[in-house]
Amino acid sequence: LYPNSVCLLTARSKKEPESSRYIWGAFMVRDDFEGAKCQDGIIRAHDKYQIFLSEQEARTLLFWTNFEPSSNNAERKWGSVEFKYFPNTTMARILCDIYLLKQNTDQKKLCEQFINYFCELNKIDKKLLILSHQKD
């Protein structure tokens, strides 16, 4: 993990199928964080770029809908690992989904700033991101 990384927070209850895994928050890694030098296993969050969803919001934002089904239609599984890595463009689309959920809240501006910051750090063209998101 590096300072241009987002930690996406997901959950599901043990009684629910993996397909019900939902997103309940996201935060940028702190500007001075270097994963290779991390000794205590704690990922420090950026002071500003942190977004948390209410339970009602989170239950509408399912994690696995952001990924294409596998070629053999096997059930997607989180497995026993703590981290999943995926393209920054996928993360940018997830941030756009969070922004849409937060349209009528006091977190709307923060969500927009979060997207701008993430896209700038990762050299993602926001215009293309918006166009691709409108197709969905």
Question: Where do the PLM segments sit?
Answer:
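Short beta-strand-centered aromatic/proline hotspots
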Residues: 21-33
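Short, charged/polar surface micro-motifs in flexible loops or helix N-caps
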Residues: 13-15, 32-35
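Short coil-to-beta transition motif at edge beta-strands of beta-rich domains
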Residues: 1-14
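Short consensus segments that form the blades of beta-propeller domains
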Residues: 16-20
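Contiguous surface segments at macromolecular interaction interfaces
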Residues: 36-136
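Generic structural hydrophobic/aromatic packing signal, biased to beta-strands
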Residues: 7-9, 29, 45
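Functionally constrained cores in energy, signaling, and assembly domains
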Residues: 7, 32, 54
